[in-house]
Amino acid sequence: MSCRSEHIWIEPITGSRKTSNFCWAVILFLGSLGFLLVGTSSYLGRNLISLFPSQQILFFPQGIVMSFYGIAGLFISSYLWCTLSLNVGGGYDRFDRKEGMVCIFRWGFPGKNRRIFLRFLIKDIQSVRIEAKEGIYARRVLYMDIRGQGAIPLTRTDENVTPREIEQKAAELAYFLRVPIEVF
């Protein structure tokens, strides 16, 4: 859902707040909580979960391993929830022909580089480039070649876009910026 006028084009970037990431965070949290409860119930010798009688699972070695998996899963789940709440990777791309500027903004992890803000002059943009790799792990990435800076990716490498969509986006952006398109 981009916002576009005659002189300004703003392209929002989703970042880590995707449905699949929410699903993985919930599944991982519930699964690791289950493992931790089973390990704890085997240690206490009580049924904290009514699905498994605590006598069937010995604390050593099954209960210890399940507790370890539960704790590790909770750490990974908390990491996922932090990236979701901080919207790591989210932001926007703003192309302003009136001012002759391109601004790329992304949210990062807390610390020195929490806000990643890049600015370029439109006249320094050499081309819009499409990099396509076919095969089992096919990927298509849209880059912007900046003179003296190299290529800056505009789409995520894990986005599953069709060749038609990436070509259309590249053509619209190249037309808006008045630069050529390169395909690799």
Swiss-Prot record:
HAMAP family associated with the record: Ycf4
InterPro entries cross-referenced by the UniProt entry: PSI_Ycf4_assembly
Family: Belongs to the Ycf4 family.
Transmembrane segments: 22-42, 57-77
Subcellular location: Plastid, Chloroplast thylakoid membrane
Keyword Aminoacyl-tRNA synthetase listed: no
Superkingdom as given in the UniProt entry: Eukaryota
Sorted UniProt keywords: Chloroplast, Membrane, Photosynthesis, Plastid, Thylakoid, Transmembrane, Transmembrane helix
Function: Seems to be required for the assembly of the photosystem I complex.
A GO term from the CC aspect: photosystem I
Species: Panax ginseng (Korean ginseng)
Membrane topology: Multi-pass membrane protein
Protein name per Swiss-Prot or TrEMBL: Photosystem I assembly protein Ycf4
Pfam families to which the protein is assigned, alphabetical: Ycf4
GO biological process: photosynthesis
